[in-house]
Amino acid sequence: MSVYDFTCTTMQGKEVSLSQYKGKVILIVNTASKCGFTPQFAGLEKLYKEYKDKGLEILGFPSNQFNEQDPGTNEEIQEFCKVNYGVTFQMFKKGDVRGDNPQPLFAYLTKEKGFKGFNMDHPIAPKLVPMLKEKHPEILEGDGIKWNFTKFLIDREGNVVER
């Protein structure tokens, strides 16, 4: 099994087989529009523009599971991303990325690449980890997605190589 075996729905409601990305490097990101990490959209878009002609695809998957930081509709989220960050990479419809009913793609990704710990050198991590311990200790358990903007790097053969 690989990411190419999954079909996901775009913000526009179109079903897309991830097999269309065969031979490309894919960065899959769970996103949110009202998060301390939201400015990462700018860096992701810059990365996409710089490397898309060399075979990079970035796929964004909004989720409202972490402190309800993406409460808008798919249309509102897409508009926010375009207006504020000029996002041109493919965004998919909002859905769960962890818990009892995650999107199948995210169940697969987290099974393939478990959680290795937070990067405590990141300026937000020293604030995020204590908040999670206090308010959402269940998030810290297991290999599920821990917060917004978790990234999975997929190689040109469809293998999950990094989280």
Regions found by a protein language model. Give the residues of each.
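Conserved helix-turn-beta segment immediately C-terminal to the redox Cys motif
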Residues: 24-26, 33-34, 38-62, 81-85
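A generic fold-level signal
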Residues: 1, 20-22, 53, 100, ...
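Thiol/selenol-based redox catalytic cores and closely related redox-interacting motifs
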Residues: 80-82, 86-163
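Stable alpha-helical elements in mature extracytoplasmic
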Residues: 40-43, 73, 77, 101-102
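Short loop/turn microsegments at loop-to-beta-strand junctions
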Residues: 3-4, 26, 148-150
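Thiol-based oxidoreductase modules, predominantly thioredoxin-like and allied folds used
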Residues: 30, 52-74, 87-99
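N-terminal "domain-start" segment that seeds a small globular fold
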Residues: 1-19
